[in-house]
Amino acid sequence: MSPRTTRTAALLVVGVLTLTAGCAGGPALDEKPSVGIAMPTTKQLRWVADGDNLSEQFGSLGFDVSMQYADDDADAQVQQIEEMVDQGVDALVIGAVDASALTAVLSSAREAGVSVVSYDRLIVGGADVDYYASFDNRRVGTMQANSLLEGVGVLDATGEPTGAKGPFAIELFAGSPDDNNAHVFFEGAMAVLAPYLESGVLVVPSGQTTFEKVATPGWSPETAAARMATLLGPYRAGTRLAGVLSPNDGIAQAVLPATADLGYLPVVTGQDAEIPAVQSVARGEQHSTVYKDTRQLAEVTVQMVRSLLTGAEPEVNDTSSYDNGAGVVPTFLLSPQLVTKDNYRAVLVDSGYYTAEEIG
């Protein structure tokens, strides 16, 4: 255990009874533990919620919190992390802009005795990542693919084949190449879609089916909208666009307007349950989204950090799936949930994630 971790562990053991999830009471510590939170962007609403949840939960447990957003600039995020280490934070929670760009700065953090938790996006290429907290990202992809198949009529509402032979024309989108999760989402989706593509039930008129061809740098909605516009030729000529595999809500909400002049709505998937997308789902426009309760993810992350700083072993439920190139990173995975027009109120409003007024 490093000198900094030893110091922090001693402080936290003194106040361990006060550091329970959801409890901010009890005597104050003489010296607060500190955490640096490095988030990738404010352009996606979900990351704003992530930052707010983390800051609130760490703060309620007596942590000094330093939080920075990098505005999708990998170099800026490296600088922000360097500054946090120089400030003397005891731990870092990082949602990476570029999963492979942090090796050097995290090596410096390790030398300074700083614990590191990779948050939602797996940091790759370096050994200086202690733990990973995320959702079952492959399952996200399979959910999106099955929702697409249900929406176009290949599967029924129970997930059973309808016998429809197609061919159903679809187009594929993936997330940013520098986000490890984007690859996992796409792999999960394609594992489901591949048999239907091979049998001809599904077809991709553009021919763009590899991750490299369908990736969206920076998860940019503008880039996705521009690409969708270039793909519309066959559909304006009479081929019906049955559906679009979209990896998140930002891209889904860019794709839908781009297809507006077709005169009908293709089935479009999403992820993150952002309010504009949920409103679109409620109106019957976007077909589905995948809900990931970032309150739970923040709670898991906070408990990981607390365990690390007190010398305890964080709880994990996956010790084999997430190899970042330097070794397997111990992981806690949460379960995502599909949201549709039929269940959005039960899933999102009844759980308290949103109010009825927010969704409208």
Whereabouts are the PLM-identified features?
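Secretory targeting and sorting signals
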Residues: 1-27
